[in-house]
C-alpha cells in the first residue's frame, strides 16, 4: 500500500510528521479521510479528533479548528490548537 506524507502543525510546534496509511479529520462540513494519491483539496477544520493510522498503530490528536491542505506531497494540517490525546 502506498504511503501518505502527513504533517500536523500547531502554533507552538510540529506534533507529527511522517509517512502513514490514512488520516481521518473533522472537516467543517463533515469528517473526511485521506489516503495516498488523494485528489487535491483544501478545507477548514472544526474542533474534533485527527486519527492517524499506520499499519496496526493508531495515534489520535485533539484539535480546535484549523485548515487542511491535501496536495501532491501529502496532507498538512495547520491547527489552531492541538495536543496528542491521552
UniProtKB/Swiss-Prot annotation:
Major subcellular location class: membrane
Keyword vocabulary terms for this entry: ATP synthesis, Cell inner membrane, Cell membrane, CF(1), Hydrogen ion transport, Ion transport, Membrane, Transport
Compartment(s) of residence: Cell inner membrane
A GO cellular component annotation in the UniProt record: proton-transporting ATP synthase complex
Membrane topology designation: Peripheral membrane protein
Keyword Transcription regulation: no
Key word Membrane present: yes
Pfam families the record matches: ATP-synt_DE_N
CDD domains per the UniProt record, alphabetical: F1-ATPase_delta
Domain of life: Bacteria
Alphabetized SUPFAM superfamilies for the sequence: Epsilon subunit of F1F0-ATP synthase N-terminal domain
Molecular function as annotated in GO: ATP binding; proton-transporting ATP synthase activity, rotational mechanism
Summary of the function given for this chain in its UniProt record: Produces ATP from ADP in the presence of a proton gradient across the membrane.
UniProt family annotation: Belongs to the ATPase epsilon chain family.
Binding partners and assembly: F-type ATPases have 2 components, CF(1) - the catalytic core - and CF(0) - the membrane proton channel. CF(1) has five subunits: alpha(3), beta(3), gamma(1), delta(1), epsilon(1). CF(0) has three main subunits: a, b and c.
Protein name: ATP synthase epsilon chain
Organism name: Caulobacter vibrioides (strain ATCC 19089 / CIP 103742 / CB 15) (Caulobacter crescentus)
Lineage summary: Bacteria, Pseudomonadati, Pseudomonadota, Alphaproteobacteria, Caulobacterales
